[in-house]
Regions:
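A cross-kingdom marker for long, charged
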Residues: 211-281
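N-terminal secretory signal peptides that target proteins for export/translocation
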Residues: 1-11
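N-terminal, post-signal-peptide region of Sec/Tat-exported proteins
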Residues: 52-89
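Acidic/His-rich structured neighborhood in mature extracellular/periplasmic domains
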Residues: 79, 83-174
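Extended amphipathic alpha-helical interaction segments
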Residues: 130-227
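Bacterial N-terminal signal peptides
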Residues: 15-25
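Sec/Tat signal peptide C-region and signal peptidase I cleavage site
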Residues: 28-32
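Immediate post-signal-peptide N-terminus of mature secreted/exported proteins
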Residues: 33-64, 153-168, 172-175
Length: 281
């Protein structure tokens, strides 16, 4: 049969590497979480790329202050890259997982994501995570949804519900906003200090609107991300995500992502003061 022998060789190497990662993950018990096994976990599940993609969220920081990146001058890009350093964020993620990820969770997730289906999912998820133009991605996702059979739409909805089975997304986004805005206020980035109680009350008023916005955004993102996969694969993914152990894994991974994002936004706010005069919120 035809085909590029170099590409075939590359696929063989990739599967050998994957087999070694899986062997490392399941070979030994997780005591105080072996760092090498956790690093393998980041790779086989794609969670490492998900952590790296947090850096792309830095572009939203000025908007939360009613400003744009250009308001912070030429130093903005350098500052954002320093604060959202991917190596630092992976280290933070590993430190949290080291304390919270147990044997059952690690083994269960690793076994699924090392499967043929799991690796197809990781491939498309990694590609979507690293796509920098969120507006273009959402527009394409919405266009796909408009022409999509309702049956597939419902499977994507079920998938998104399973990814955040604890329903923490809205509260997490609110907490990130609170921590960032308070840090910006304390650092003098804003002209006047923010009252935390008033800020939380204001965010609570918009909670329903935020929930719908996040739901619509997640659905468009799923339509874009999984467009190349058949509905049978998506149904199998939903079943895997709904397993109680996988639900625990995702609850932890979501918490890790949210904590790292909130922490980095706090650090960013503290360092933004040197880039611009005080601004009103």
């Amino acid at each position: 049969m035809g085909g590029n022998p170099l590409r075939s060789y590359g696929r063989g190497v990739a599967w050998v590497a994957l087999a070694l990662l899986l062997a490392l993950l399941v070979a030994a018990p997780l005591r105080a979480a072996d760092r090498a096994r956790l690093e393998a976990f980041l790779e086989v599940t794609g969670f490492g790329v998900a952590l790296d993609s947090i850096a792309l969220s830095a572009s939203g920081a000025p908007e939360m202050l009613g400003l744009s990146a250009s308001d912070f001058g030429q130093g903005w890009s350098t500052l954002a890259e320093e604060v959202f350093d991917t190596g630092r964020m992976r280290e933070m993620g590993l430190s949290i997982l080291e304390q919270a990820l147990d044997d059952e969770m690690l083994g269960h997730a690793a076994e699924f994501y090392a499967s043929d289906l799991g690796q197809r999912l990781v491939a498309v998820e990694n590609a979507a995570h690293l796509h920098e133009d969120d507006d273009a991605k959402r527009a394409e996702g919405e266009a796909l949804l408009a022409a999509m059979p309702q049956e597939r739409v419902e499977v994507l909805r079920a998938m998104n519900a399973a990814v955040d089975s604890a329903g923490t997304g809205v509260r997490a986004v609110q907490e990130i906003q609170v921590r960032f805005l308070l840090a910006a206020s304390y650092a003098g980035v804003l002209e006047s200090e923010i009252d935390e109680g008033m800020l939380r009350a204001l965010l609570a008023e918009g909670e329903d609107e935020l929930r719908e916005s996040l739901r619509a955004s997640a659905l468009a993102s799923a339509a874009y991300t999984y467009q190349s996969l058949p509905i049978e694969d998506l149904r199998a993914y939903v079943a895997a995500l709904e397993h109680p152990t996988m639900a625990r894994v995702y609850e932890l991974m979501n918490a890790v992502q949210y904590e790292i994002m909130a922490n980095r936004f706090e650090v960013l706010a503290a360092r933004m003061r040197g880039l611009t005069p005080a601004q009103e919120l």
